[in-house]
Regions:
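Bacterial N-terminal signal peptides that target proteins for export
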Residues: 1-8
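Low-complexity, intrinsically disordered segments exposed to solvent
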Residues: 26-328
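C-terminal motif of bacterial Sec signal peptides marking the signal peptidase cleavage site
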Residues: 15-19
């Protein structure tokens, strides 16, 4: 249990911080929230259309990193519960503090079924995690609670285990060096059994998942409101086809952008975690733009000032440049 709950999750959090510089279709349809005006324009040409580039960065990396944290947390708890059974287990973290998990088997079936609940809590839990040859001291506090809404299949083979579950972050925070982040809010995640086309289907939705970050003294926030992610993972190629929709709002020192996301062509994502194909569009109440990804790492932004249906500017950038914008 310690391995899955503590080491796996801490490593995932550390990777997120390092990147910052320091089943059924049970997910449900979450309607987009009423879109609010943004304080900055996507179509502002200043600094090479920096606002549009930043919006593209937050659209993909903000969605990916937030979903990954919730998903890894949920999967870790499911694996831990299937291995250890009901009850509470606490462990001491290597650098001090504690990590604990509680699994409540409501029907006494000694398996994961609808109605079961779980929670995990970190109290100043410190671990040294080695990433890219460097040792990163990561401190976790707060926790998450989980509710299994539906489940079927044996947990002994998680590939054949389908579920719908809600994960709620309760001031779950991580700090490493000069970077910190805090998660709050709920995300519902569903997983299918293998489909006839040899894929696993994942759906994630959220109305209020929030991430507050402080990266080298620069603060920002991300809010998923009426947001949805659809992911088809190929069991043959182990690549994902990801579609994003709904609302993603973010605030940086430059202002806020409230984006409505649509995916015209699913994003092709491999082991690197970055798209090598596909296109996603993002719009404010005034402007809209799209980002098309290539296998070379190049990204083309097409900007439509005033949402007239005409491309008014085309910007060339790279996925690494967008990742840097998101991390800083």
């Amino acid at each position: 249990m310690k391995t899955w709950l503590q080491t796996t999750l801490i490593t995932a959090m550390a990777v997120s911080l390092a990147a910052c510089g320091g089943g059924d279709d049970g997910g449900g349809i979450v309607p987009p929230a009423p879109q609010q005006p943004s304080s900055i324009r996507l179509a502002d040409p200043a600094n090479g259309y920096l606002n549009a580039q930043t919006a593209a960065a937050y659209t993909y990396f903000g969605s990916r990193d937030t979903y990954s944290l919730y998903a890894i947390s949920l999967f870790s708890v499911i694996i831990a519960a299937s291995q250890a059974g009901p009850g509470t287990v606490s462990t001491n973290c290597t650098g001090g503090g504690t990590a604990s998990i509680t699994f409540n088997d409501r029907d006494g079936s000694n398996s994961i079924t609808a109605g079961d609940t779980a929670s995990m809590t970190f109290a100043n839990c410190q671990e040294n995690v080695e990433l890219a040859g460097a040792t990163l001291l990561t401190t976790l506090n707060g926790g998450m609670s989980f509710v299994i809404n539906a489940a079927s299949g044996p947990t002994a083979n998680l590939q054949d285990f389908s579920f719908v579950a809600a994960a709620t972050a309760n001031n779950l925070s991580a700090q490493a060096g000069t970077a910190s982040m805090t998660f709050n809010g709920t995300m519902t995640i569903s997983k299918s059994i293998p489909q006839p086309d040899s894929t696993l289907r994942y759906i994630a939705t959220s109305n209020d998942a929030t991430v507050n970050r402080n990266i080298n003294g620069v603060q920002d926030s991300i809010v998923l409101a009426g947001w949805r992610l659809d992911d088809a993972l190929s069991l043959l190629t182990f690549t994902d086809q990801v579609s994003l929709s709904g609302n993603l709002n973010f605030t940086t020192p430059s202002g806020n952008e409230n984006l409505l996301l649509t995916t015209s062509s699913p994003l092709i994502v491999g082991a690197t975690g970055v798209p090598s194909g596909g296109a996603v569009a993002f719009a404010t109440t005034e402007d809209q733009a799209s980002a098309s990804f290539a296998s070379t790492g190049d990204v083309t932004l097409a900007i439509d000032a005033g949402k007239t249906g005409t491309v008014t500017a085309t910007i060339s950038t790279t996925i690494s440049a967008l990742e840097s914008l998101f991390g800083n």
